[in-house]
Amino acid sequence: MDRGQPSLEPAAAAPRASGRCVIAPVRAVLRLRRRVCVLRKRRLLQPGGGPDVGTGAPRPGCSPRAPRADLDQPKFFTFDSPAELPSRTPRKKRRRSRLVLYPETSRKYRPRVEHRSRAQRCLLLLVAIVGFQVLNAIENLDDNAQRYDLDGLEKALQRAVFGQPAAVSRIVALMRDYLATHVHSRPLLLALHGPSGVGKSHVGRLLARHFRSVLEDSALVLQYHARHHCPEARAAQDCREELARRVADVVARAEAEEKTPLLVLDDVELMPRPLLDELHGFLQPQRSHHFHNAIYVLLSGAGGAEVTRFVLQNASRALPLRPDGFRSAEAAAAQAEEDLRASLLAVLSREHPLWQAAAIVPFLLLDKRDVVSCFRDEMAGEGFFPDQARAENLAAQLSFYRVAGREFAVTGCKQVVATVNLL
């Protein structure tokens, strides 16, 4: 080979070297591009990944490596421009805060209740039972009192008894309080005191009649007249035994029927001391409870002189009251009546201790107006026309105490029946 001709081997080696220098960077760029495409596709496959989620448009150069899911999804043609597609990309869902979990033995909103002991529960149950019993007892109070029709008794006494409004009110009030319950620790002992003819025996008869009607058994009402059942000729011990037997029979029968009997004893001032001792024995705590569930009404003229003196001394207080001074006068009258009961109790207690356990009910003197009312009532009952003028003429024939411009009958209405019978 001639030295003057250039050799072709170095010329061929130079293009090879330059080709290798160009291909190597291109291959590196392709590898980087493929890796970027793979990373982007992985982000697309992850939930909530990247802003390109849901576009479905792979980057140029990444189509050869597209996942199978993108190839299988159908393609729909729309008139939306490519610029509008990114605006419809779904927003990322906000991550909700996780719920706070509580233990199963506790509550979410209420504090944990402290454990109560069994003793506290038993105490609450006991309080509930006692409260129920108290309410039941309160409801039964009216039921037991309604059996005796005390409202009807009060109306009957106010209609038939003249001049004794305070005594009638006190009798009904005491009976109403006592008859509110059936079981009692002590009996009710009413002592009606006053002079003759003021209505004590009349009230006793009205009480006996009313209780016979409401109890529907006359055997539960005992009327004992000392003048008739125990005259002076009879031995006091025999009278005492008879009284004890009759009272025992009545209270035993009433206990069997679960009712409260009524025992009316008239002319108690004529009773010998053994009978008063027997009556006092009925009130003792050691006696059977049968004797405690009863109403004893004692009618006596003892203390009549004390009542007469009190009425005559306080006659001016009973004058017609002015409307402006009604309350003060009523309070003064109540205080005077309380003083009268206290003085009667002091006088009667000296005679026998029986009166210390009694509720004293004083019967005052009747004025002329009350006596006229007695005459009119008796005349109507006997078939006469109750003329006011004629009744006043009959009342004028009686004796009266004249004090402070008022007239009080000496014998009350005791002579009214005999006077009307002479018509």
Curated annotation (Swiss-Prot):
The transmembrane segments are 122-138
- SUPFAM superfamilies the UniProt entry points to: P-loop containing nucleoside triphosphate hydrolases
Location in the cell: Membrane
Q: Which Pfam families match?
A: Torsin
Point out residues bearing the modification Phosphoserine: S63, S81, S106
**Keyword Transmembrane among UniProt keywords:** yes
* Phosphothreonine sites (modified residues): T89
Superkingdom field? Eukaryota
Which UniProt key words apply to this protein? ATP-binding, Membrane, Nucleotide-binding, Phosphoprotein, Transmembrane, Transmembrane helix
Annotated membrane topology: Single-pass membrane protein
Q: Where does ATP bind?
A: G194, P195, S196, G197, V198, G199, K200, S201
Q: Name one GO cellular component term.
A: nuclear envelope
Q: Fetch the InterPro entries from UniProt.
A: AAA+_ATPase (IPR003593), P-loop_NTPase (IPR027417), Torsin (IPR010448)
Q: GO molecular function terms here?
A: ATP binding; ATP hydrolysis activity
Q: Where is this region: Disordered?
A: 47-68
What PANTHER family does the annotation carry?
TORSIN, TORSIN-4A
Family the UniProt entry places it in = Belongs to the ClpA/ClpB family. Torsin subfamily.
Protein's UniProt name: Torsin-4A
Q: What is the species listed in this Swiss-Prot or TrEMBL entry? A: Homo sapiens (Human)
Q: Which gene encodes it?
A: TOR4A
